[in-house]
Amino acid sequence: MADGQTPPRTPVKLADYRPPAFLVEHVALDFELEPEATIVHARLKLRRNTPGPLKLDGRKLELLSIALNGEALGDNRYTLDAQSLTLPEMPDEAVLETSVRIDPAANTELSGLYMSGSGFFTQCEAEGFRKITFFPDRPDVMARYHVRMRADADKFPILLSNGNKLASGVENGKAYAEWEDPHPKPSYLFALVAADLVAVKDEFTTASGRKVELGVWVERGDETRCDHAMGALKRSMKWDEEVFGLEYDLDIFNIAAVSDFNAGAMENKGLNIFNTAYVLADSKTATDADFQNVERVIAHEYFHNWTGDRVTCRDWFQPVSYTHLT
């Protein structure tokens, strides 16, 4: 098991940067969501980039199975420690499949997949994805994602992820949903929400005439305080088109608001996750400054759709560039 104490921090130097040995062209994730025992199946389509072994980051993951090109691997074919999974001998192209078990309820770091209030949420910037599954968890590895998830339909009826929704429903007491993001993205922009939420919905017509479905997802009782947030989102989308010619590139854009989200707001592709402080506002309870903060933060995170999400950083010395550009 890749577990144990948080490893001591070591200095990271720009001069030490090396390109990844393997790139991930596509990743398929399948989640069986349970608060204390979530199972994550991952299927990575890999392509060699430079010489060297395949090293995947992973922390606090219980490895259940591993297969390479359909062949189950014995423990003599890989090495596993508290921070990584390494395969020393790899073909230049391969499909790697792993299954792991994680404990979102015990994840008090609020990094990776964790429980909060009404459900499951994620925060993967900067290195949270490695607490979900084994992966080259670095921003210069960009992949297309296909996500399936199942959860208790009574407790977690709403299942959200990046990209466009392909399917959803209820089967044998389990809610299920399937999402696909057609645009390559780094792992730090992965997002998942499974919770009992309600949505304020609207739509936006892009400059080319496409209809985009908009949703602001909040806890029950908070939906009356979302009008300003929805208006701010639509104004941001229009401004980005008019000023920079940047049209939104998916069919759906969602915001999910979490009361104890520890990052303020996060620009995950197609599924922004916010602290409620930057979403909820009405004339009875909010000041002018509150309204301005909602407008400012929603605009900033939406603008990351191009400067940060589609065009991202190579390493963690570069985010200041796209953040200031945004």
Report the location of each language-model feature.
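Catalytic Zn2+-binding segment of zinc metalloproteases
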Residues: 302-317
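Surface-exposed beta-strand/loop patches in extracellular or lumenal glycoproteins
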Residues: 45-60, 148-150
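N-terminal, polar/Ser/Thr-rich
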Residues: 1-39, 114-119, 123, 135, ...
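Hydrophobic helix-coil surface modules that form long, contiguous segments used
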Residues: 124-127, 135-299, 315, 322-325
